[in-house]
Amino acid sequence: MEQQEIIHISISEAAQAHFRCLLEQQEPNTHIRIFVVNPGTPSAECGVSYCPSNAVEETDTEFKFTGFSAFVDELSLPFLADAEIDYVTDQMGAQLTLKAPNSKMRKIADDAPFIERLDYVIQTQVNPQLASHGGQVTLIEVTEDKYAILQFGGGCNGCSMVDVTLKEGIEKQLLATFPTELKGVKDVTEHQRGEHSYY
């Protein structure tokens, strides 16, 4: 299938072995299904379930692995681009991990307008880092003199660390990604300190 060349989903050897072990206990010809609930939204969640042969749809895309296949529905497919499934063992035991960087926002083309590519990087790389502080950044506009105007929300609003975060973290990251298209970032939010501020 054409789409399989574009969309890449990787399952580590450990995770493949784990799936094979689980599937041996199921009916013959049972595979796995990888899906996204609420794809393209901040509340997107990925999951893996068993997929009996009679549950495969014509519109599904099949990814073949040793001893089993992973099926992905048409709606979830673009949001699972570059997804990685691993089976990690540590002192606390073993668990399956599923990283899908594009689940909350569809992957965009390299030749998409600059503002779309910039927003994609903010949503998939910057905001996940800020989420640990309960904060987020929204791209408001890109000025003619190549400055990205950003609005901080959540725990970042009124945070005394914003200048440091903005200049050192986000600006550095975005300039490294877009060295010719961007000169810097500016903050549009009037930072009023409130009880929800992290620092």
Swiss-Prot record:
Subunit structure: Homodimer.
Signal sequence range: none
Needed co-factor(s): [4Fe-4S] cluster
Family assignment from sequence similarity: Belongs to the NfuA family.
Keywords: 4Fe-4S, Iron, Iron-sulfur, Metal-binding
Cofactor note: Binds 1 [4Fe-4S] cluster per subunit. The cluster is presumably bound at the interface of two monomers.
The protein's name: Fe/S biogenesis protein NfuA
GO biological process, one term: iron-sulfur cluster assembly
Disulfide cysteine pairs (residue numbers): none
Residues given in the record as [4Fe-4S] cluster binding sites: 156, 159
